[in-house]
Each structure stands twice: as C-alpha cells, then as structure tokens.
Amino acid sequence: MKSGEKDYSVKEAMIFSQRIAQLSKALWKCVEKDWQQWIKPYDLNINEHHILTIAYHLKGASISEIAKFGVMHVSTAFNFSKKLEERGYLVFSKKEDDKRNTYIEITDKGEELLLRLMEEYDPENNSVFNGALALRNFYGKFPENIELIAILRNIYGQDFIDIFEKSLEDIEENFTESDQKLVKK
C-alpha cells in the first residue's frame, strides 16, 4: 500500500457507519424509553439520574468530569446539577487549591434516592435486557460488547472506559440481591 492510501473502501466505510448509526439509534430509542419509565416515579430525567449515578460512583466529581463521563455538554451538566442541588440531592463546592472548577458530591438524600431506584429496577421492564436474554440463555452469559467498548475507548479515551468499568465493579462489589431486589451490602 502506498503512503496516504487507505486500506478500506469508501463503500465499506459508509456501510459500517450507517450500520452503527441505525443500530445505535434503534438501541437508544429502547434504552431511553426504559430509562425514562424506570426513573419517572421519582421525578427525575435521564440527565439528572446519570449525574447522580456518576457523582455516586466517583464519590464527588468536577462538573467537567460529570460532563465527560455523562457524555453531555458542560452547561448541561452544570444546569441539571444545579436542579439536583436545589432538591437537596447534590452539594456544590470549590477546592482550596482549585478555585476554577466546581465540584459536586451526592448528599445522603441523593444517595437514598439512588439506592431506592436501584432497588426498584425490574429487569422485566427493560426491553434491551429482554432482547439480550435469548443470547444469555443460549451462550450462558450476556454479550460483553468488547468491540463496542473498543470503539468508545478510541473515541472518548481510556479514562471514560475506566470510569464506566469502575461503576460496574462498584455495583458488583457493594450490592447484593435480596428478594429479587438490588440492595447495598
């Protein structure tokens, strides 16, 4: 291959890009609907729930970190965090050695809400989970999505994947199942 030549065709690139776009859009529609139904009784929207979850797993974070790991604009992270603060779920602070960044921490009230939501999670009401159940039943495990994780690592960086993995490890290590509900150990 000559310098500057690509080892893929434009047609191949288009088909791949369109496949990812269509699959992502279809998957997101299901994820969004399921997520909204799950958190609706608690008067939260997806961004607010995501911010609470990130703040919980990071044990405090800057607004920039919330934006990065929540895949949202900094102003979106700030505005929704402000609403959560007004409801008593988060507190804002500045660090002595870093006055430029605003930090948030989940409050006891915010943690209680998040834990209650985790207890209320019902896999039967999750269409993506139910869609993957046949694969688990056949192969004995859920898809691990390693190719998707690799793509996201190349787009967002290793830090993004590390935080994502840490949140899942936190659930694995710090929660147990009791009466078909997820509860903190």
Curated annotation (Swiss-Prot):
Gene3D superfamilies: Winged helix-like DNA-binding domain superfamily/Winged helix DNA-binding domain. GO terms for molecular function: DNA binding; DNA-binding transcription factor activity. GO terms for biological process: negative regulation of DNA-templated transcription; regulation of DNA-templated transcription; response to stress; sporulation resulting in formation of a cellular spore. PROSITE patterns: HTH_MARR_1, HTH_MARR_2. InterPro entries: HTH_MarR-typ, HTH_tscrpt_reg_Hpr, MarR/SlyA-like, Tscrpt_reg_MarR-type_CS, WH-like_DNA-bd_sf, WH_DNA-bd_sf. The keyword Magnesium does not apply. It comes from the Bacteria. Residues 63-86 bind DNA. Residues 13-157 form the HTH marR-type domain. Keywords: DNA-binding, Repressor, Sporulation, Transcription, Transcription regulation. Negative regulator of protease production and sporulation. Homodimer. This is HTH-type transcriptional regulator Hpr. The gene is hpr.
